[in-house]
Amino acid sequence: MDEILSWGGPDATLQPEEIRSALAEILAHYGTGSRVLAVPPDFTRFYSYAGQITAMLQQLLGDRLTDVLPALGTHVAVTDRERETMFPGVPASLFRVHDWRTDLVTLGEVPRELIRELSENKLDWPWPAQVNRLVAEGGHDLILSIGQVVPHEVVGMANHAKNLLVGTGGRDGINRSHFLGAVYGMERIMGRADNPVRAVLNYAAENFLAELPIVYVLTVIGADDHGELAVRGLFAGRGLECFYRAAELALEVNFTMVEEAPEHVVAWLDPEEFHSTWLGNKAIYRSRMMIADGGRLTVLAPGVGTFGEDPGIDRLIRRYGYRGTPATLAAVESDPEMAEDLSAAAHLIHGSSEGRFEIRYAAGGLSRDEVESVGFTALDMSDTYTRYHLDTLTDGWNMLPSGERIYYISRPALGLWAQADRFRDEYPRST
């Protein structure tokens, strides 16, 4: 049976010294050998506390920590500034860059029959279980997969095997997992620890990762009474159970259920963290189950200056926009470039309200024409900032001087919000 090491709870605030002590216990329990690989997330998961954990591990392990491989997926590499900010004190010489095009080993395939069943007969292909060559063939005695369990639009609850199979995976695996989640339905997945995408990852973890010396180190992060982020939980284990324990706490900490569906939600995107709609549309994903039919979502995004994280995806977003599921599926059928980039197709589906509510974007680095060309309503950044008195807003319900009542979200990537009638747990746990 998988033994779980865990600390914290829904009201806990784990201090750095407690976390360092817990990490020392994890290393003592599982053993380190002489070669350890750490796989943390990249800067887009800055608030996961994984950077500080990696720094603590480097202090505890010394020369035994031989490699740090940020789980980039298809994101751009971590810059020197991002690395120094997120991983304080960790030598630059330890960092490796995942290239999802070339640095891959295929460990096996999830059979097409299972994909067909999980997708309700919408998809008919196998799923390749791929990881970075350093994970599969690096000769490490211990692989520490580090990250935050938090509600997620593709996989329901982020992390565990996703960190390796998607974060250090290849194009086909990333594209197909995203597209599976999109065709099954994002609102049927978000916040649920079990769903078709997680079932695929669990199958791959149990059948293809089990022989690797992987230990998952998982955090749960929540806001304290003063709105500051706190580490609520820390979990470690080799199998699936540590993920389910963390997901249970994350649902308690990161999920907000509202009885009344807001007519207007305003979300802020930190300009240091969000530079594209590819990442910034988490404001849409995480709030969509809360917004009233015919309502509005206003996204304040001063740092957003592009759509995609790479030129190819940016081009597809500009070509097709966020027009809803039928239009996107038609593009997949008619355009070979879109058919080859199913993660872009999934992103376009996720980023549409399907006509249910209006999405208004105040993007600091995109023109009005650019914003409106993809199907959003464009707003002026400075006017919007002033209109909504951003300096005075608190998370949750606010009454503006104009008399308008809005719901404000300052960190959409760290939670999930839903109106009670829109959240139903319908998928059985995979084992």
Language model: regions and residue ranges:
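Histidine-anchored nucleotide/phosphate-binding helix
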Residues: 45-64, 280-291
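Long, charge-dense
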Residues: 67-116, 321-340
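N-terminal amphipathic/basic leader segments beginning at the initiator methionine
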Residues: 1-18
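Short glycine-rich or small-residue beta-strand-to-loop segments that form or flank ligand, phosphate
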Residues: 35-46, 69-73, 145, 265-268
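Extended hydrophobic packing segments that form well-structured cores
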Residues: 13-20, 354-431
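Glycine-rich phosphate/diphosphate-binding loops that line cofactor/substrate pockets in enzymes
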Residues: 22-37, 61-62, 137-139, 255-264, ...
